[in-house]
Amino acid sequence: MANKIIFMGTPIFCVPILKSLYQNGYNISVVFTQPPQKSHRGQKINKSPIQGISETLNIDYRTPKTLKDNQEEYEFLKELNADLAIVVAYGQIIPSNFLNLTKKGFINIHASLLPKWRGPAPIQRSIMNLDKRTGISIMRISDKLDSGPVCNSYAIEILKN
């Protein structure tokens, strides 16, 4: 039986990752993303890029406002009995009581070379601080923000323009 994977992400940055997992035959059981929000000048309600691609790929998705103290989502994930959760720029901190709900834990794909630029907006912070290089870190999620052990990383040079 294929591993059950939970995917958690929101912005356009996550779309190629979810598409790649799907196209390579990984069993994405459910996607979690931020709920639709008002944006742009007209304050039109827009769904996240991950919700859009989940609909296109016909993957079940959930859009809880928060996971903190959310018994419904906790019970859902407990019942799902997934093997692994992959988190990419989800936009919410995963509560510590959720971290034991998968067999192999939660991993985070973070857009910086940790420990540098923990937290939100690591790409923008690298550019604003004129860093010469940045990268991607894959880490296990712990109960502190972007502080679990790094499993792997990939560095790239930041070029002018």
For the regions a protein language model found, what residue spans apply to each?
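One-carbon transfer enzymes
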Residues: 1-161
